[in-house]
């Protein structure tokens, strides 16, 4: 009897990708096969995103495609928290579960396709679990949910309040990743710098010593594992200052992904964000004094309800002052269930949002171009993401996969994915570098 085959669609952010990895690991550990095609599989699981309307539409389209090509579909993920929306469009889905509902997903799979006889000597799963990323990097999710109440966000409604994983459990997973050959660990959560707050920074034993479930302790321990460690989704809380020396010492990468969202005090107040542009500017300056190599990435929203031209100009001025290395920008999109819908603020016309988005991107492109020019002539370590003989593409310590820039590399010797090589930077453009491996 052949093992049941499950096709899988993973949509949304890296945190959802980790959820998909966990489900697939569970399936593989029970002997299921994972299929690349819907057609011929025993069922399809669609892990959805439900944050923005565009993401909801993409999720609903993916469910429809799976129904057309297979017919047996289980839906999970953030959009699964709204089963009525899914049933209205696709009444024939077999089961719907919300985010992080791993056991419910497995139970639904068992009802459609019971697990095969299990032979642990044949159905081997890697100790680090099944990963959907390339072998040389992996996401490490340290918590679920978020206790902040930003007015534009529905993550707490979808995923609940902050629930931190025990630090010894997180470090054990990281250790397994390193043992499996992972060269770069990307730490993710909804609020990485709040790690452990919900459990009062509970202590645990790790390698015969006591460590706290806290951002600093986690950073320090990961920094001893001998791989690149990159911090994502960090709020600019004061205690983040304690981690910057670890970056200056080369323990973890000099990189912080901080979603500032805006710079205008009025807009930040309406967003209910725990930040202020003057404080963040001073904090970034202080961080760079401690770690001159630091790269800051952030995301921003333009066209938020009530945003005036003065507010937007304040954001552009802040970009000029802060000169952060990487920035993404989104045009505000109303999210069903978000508090922003009830604030009674004047909506920004779509054409104004579009114009401000272009102005923002032009400003940041100019900043990025000037900063990257300063890299020309330097020799930088680069991790290889793609290789074709002596031509390849990789990333510096200042660039995360898929969202930041790349280094386009030529080499006298064949390049291998996952290797970290020294590259002499010979040219730059708006977002990327070009150089030769030495």
Swiss-Prot record:
Gene Ontology BP, a term: tRNA modification
Top-rank taxon: Bacteria
Comment on bound cofactor: Binds 2 [4Fe-4S] clusters. One cluster is coordinated with 3 cysteines and an exchangeable S-adenosyl-L-methionine.
Catalytic reaction(s) noted: L-aspartate(89)-[ribosomal protein uS12]-hydrogen + (sulfur carrier)-SH + AH2 + 2 S-adenosyl-L-methionine = 3-methylsulfanyl-L-aspartate(89)-[ribosomal protein uS12]-hydrogen + (sulfur carrier)-H + 5'-deoxyadenosine + L-methionine + A + S-adenosyl-L-homocysteine + 2 H(+)
Subcellular location field: Cytoplasm
SMART domains associated with the record: Elp3 (SM00729)
Span of domain TRAM: 373-438
Keyword check for Magnesium: no
Residue ranges occupied by any Radical SAM core domain in the UniProt entry: 132-370
CDD domains listed in its UniProt record: Radical_SAM
GO terms of molecular function: 4 iron, 4 sulfur cluster binding; aspartic acid methylthiotransferase activity; metal ion binding; protein methylthiotransferase activity
Function statement: Catalyzes the methylthiolation of an aspartic acid residue of ribosomal protein uS12.
Record protein name field: Ribosomal protein uS12 methylthiotransferase RimO
């Amino acid at each position: 009897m052949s093992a049941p085959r499950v096709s899988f669609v993973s949509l949304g952010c890296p945190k959802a990708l980790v959820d998909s990895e966990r489900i697939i690991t569970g399936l593989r550990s029970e002997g299921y096969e994972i299929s690349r095609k819907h057609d011929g599989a025993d069922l399809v699981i669609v892990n959805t995103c439900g944050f923005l309307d565009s993401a909801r539409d993409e999720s609903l389209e993916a469910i429809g495609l799976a129904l057309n090509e297979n017919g047996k579909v289980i839906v999970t993920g953030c959009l699964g928290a709204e089963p009525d929306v899914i049933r209205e469009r696709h009444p024939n889905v077999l089961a719907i579960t919300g985010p992080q509902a791993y056991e419910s997903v497995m139970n639904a799979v068992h009802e459609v396709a019971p697990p095969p006889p299990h032979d642990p000597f044949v159905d081997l799963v890697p100790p680090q679990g099944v990963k959907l990323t390339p072998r040389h990097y992996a996401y490490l999710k340290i918590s679920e949910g978020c206790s902040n109440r930003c007015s534009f966000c529905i993550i707490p409604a979808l995923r609940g309040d902050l629930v931190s994983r025990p630090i010894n459990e997180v470090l054990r997973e990281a250790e397994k990743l390193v043992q499996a050959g992972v060269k770069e660990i990307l730490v993710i959560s909804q609020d990485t710098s709040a790690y452990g707050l919900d459990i009062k920074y509970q202590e645990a034993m790790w390698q015969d010593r006591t460590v706290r479930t806290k951002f600093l302790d986690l950073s320090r321990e990961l920094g001893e594992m001998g791989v690149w460690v990159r911090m994502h989704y960090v709020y600019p809380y004061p205690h983040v200052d304690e981690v910057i020396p670890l970056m200056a010492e080369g323990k973890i990468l000099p990189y912080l992904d901080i979603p500032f969202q805006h710079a205008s005090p009025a807009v930040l107040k309406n967003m209910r964000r725990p930040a202020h542009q003057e404080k963040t500017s001073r904090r970034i300056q202080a961080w760079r004094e401690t770690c001159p190599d630091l790269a800051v990435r952030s995301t921003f929203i333009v066209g938020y309800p009530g945003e005036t031209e003065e507010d937007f100009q304040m954001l552009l001025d802040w970009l000029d002052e802060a000169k952060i290395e990487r920035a993404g920008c989104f045009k505000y999109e109303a999210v069903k269930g978000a508090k922003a819908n009830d604030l009674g603020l004047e909506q920004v016309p779509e054409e104004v949002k579009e114009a401000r988005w272009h102005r923002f991107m032009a400003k940041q492109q100019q900043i990025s171009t000037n900063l990257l020019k300063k890299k020309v002539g330097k020799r930088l370590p680069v991790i290889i993401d793609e290789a074709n003989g002596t031509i390849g593409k990789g990333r510096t310590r200042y660039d995360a996969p898929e969202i930041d820039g790349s280094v386009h590399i030529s080499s006298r010797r064949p390049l291998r994915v996952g290797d970290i090589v020294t590259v002499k930077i010979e040219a730059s453009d708006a977002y990327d570098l070009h150089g030769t491996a030495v």
